[in-house]
Amino acid sequence: MRVVGLISGGKDSCFNMLQCVSAGHSIVALANLRPADHAASDELDSYMYQTVGHQAVDLIAEAMGLPLYRRTIEGSSVHIDREYSPTDGDEVEDLYQLLKHVKEEMHVDGVSVGAILSDYQRVRVENVCARLQLQPLAYLWRRDQAALLSEMISSGLHAILIKVAAFGLHPDKHLGKSLAEMELYLHELSEKYGVHICGEGGEYETFTLDCPLFKKKIIIDATETVIHSDDAFAPVGFLRFTKMHTEDKTEVRTL
């Protein structure tokens, strides 16, 4: 199938695209929903979308050599019942309009979706895909999270933490750390406090700097740390990318 990769920049959306290719599908375009330029924060109060790291999403398209379709999130979480039906002003309708445009231009048959555990997201993506006669491809759905994280790391996917929001995770200590660096500690947090190893409870979010599908790798040159909530036990903070570029993988970087 001709597939559009629905991406946030995080590990799940990128790894699911890798699974699509392994299954014989072709990723022909990427799609992303982003906050408005005038948004008060990179971190939108969205039930559906990761928006932290949106400044660098275009570099994923550059790294993969694919067209990127983007749309501003204009709606909000209006229809929050378990089942979803089309609702004016809901952020799900932004996804509908985005994928409708991609289907018209790129003649795609399927959508790569990095959902692992959220029924809320799954139901809404399936609703949009059904309305557009697109096939959702969610190879990570309900996978064991410990095994999945290990598989991501061993596949050559390199992602860093760009948001933390859980007891045991601290902006000063853990933002910018790679999944490989964090794997054992995430296991500890899971055993002690029930933290979801893949961050499916909102404990952390990531941004992918390299993976086997990338023809180039992404280099983050400069960031700033934003503290969203200075809670004494579980502070919420994220990285804002201020300077970044892509680089050929064959290049040897010198310090």
UniProtKB/Swiss-Prot annotation:
Enzyme class: ligase
Keyword Ligase: yes
Pfam families: Diphthami_syn_2
The reaction(s) this protein catalyses: diphthine-[translation elongation factor 2] + NH4(+) + ATP = diphthamide-[translation elongation factor 2] + AMP + diphosphate + H(+)
Similarity annotation: Belongs to the Diphthine--ammonia ligase family.
PANTHER family per UniProt: DIPHTHINE--AMMONIA LIGASE, DOMAIN OF UNKNOWN FUNCTION 71 DUF71 -CONTAINING PROTEIN
Function: Amidase that catalyzes the last step of diphthamide biosynthesis using ammonium and ATP. Diphthamide biosynthesis consists in the conversion of an L-histidine residue in the translation elongation factor eEF-2 (EEF2) to diphthamide.
Name of the protein this chain belongs to: Diphthine--ammonia ligase
UniProt organism field: Danio rerio
